[in-house]
Amino acid sequence: MEAPAQLLFLLLLWLPDTTGEIVMTQSPATLSVSPGERATLSCRASQSVSSNLAWYQQKPGQAPRLLIYGASTRATGIPARFSGSGSGTEFTLTISSLQSEDFAVYYCQQYNNWP
């Protein structure tokens, strides 16, 4: 049995708007999983962002890679094991069967309100 590896992702990501900050809170901060297992990452907005939510993956020394936009639409070339769901204030990124290349940092970003 393979030793668990860690998925790390940002606890907090926020973008300000003209009426106040929208705070994006991700949980859990770390997730210990093994290849082949399912990983579920959550993101909560402090106010509704409709479906204007994106998920990114970042590996050391690389730029962030867009995985999901519109809360549930996979970007071009993203494998079907990645799926997004949710709307309003509650969102989820699911990786159905983790591959070794999936161990990375994951971010959610709202784009409903911009500075």
Curated annotation (Swiss-Prot):
Function: V region of the variable domain of immunoglobulin light chains that participates in the antigen recognition. Immunoglobulins, also known as antibodies, are membrane-bound or secreted glycoproteins produced by B lymphocytes. In the recognition phase of humoral immunity, the membrane-bound immunoglobulins serve as receptors which, upon binding of a specific antigen, trigger the clonal expansion and differentiation of B lymphocytes into immunoglobulins-secreting plasma cells.
Cystine crosslinks: C43-C108
Segments forming domain Ig-like: 21-115
Keywords: Adaptive immunity, Cell membrane, Disulfide bond, Immunity, Immunoglobulin, Immunoglobulin domain, Membrane, Secreted, Signal
Stretch list, region Framework-1: 21-43
Domain of life: Eukaryota
Name the UniProt record assigns to this protein: Immunoglobulin kappa variable 3-15
Pfam families membership: V-set
Region (Complementarity-determining-2): 70-76
Residue segments, region Complementarity-determining-3: 109-115
GO cellular component terms listed in the entry, alphabetical order: blood microparticle; extracellular region; immunoglobulin complex; plasma membrane
Region listing for Framework-3, in residue ranges: 77-108
GO biological process assignments: adaptive immune response; immune response
Compartments, as annotated in UniProt: Secreted; Cell membrane
Matches recorded under InterPro entries: Ig-like_dom, Ig-like_dom_sf, Ig-like_fold, Ig_sub, Ig_V-set, IgV_Light_Chain
Region named Framework-2: 55-69
UniProt GO molecular function: antigen binding
Key word Membrane present: yes
Region (Complementarity-determining-1): 44-54
Subunit structure: Immunoglobulins are composed of two identical heavy chains and two identical light chains; disulfide-linked.
PANTHER family in UniProt: IMMUNOGLOBULIN LIGHT CHAIN
Leader sequence segment: 1-20
Residues passing through the membrane, by range: none
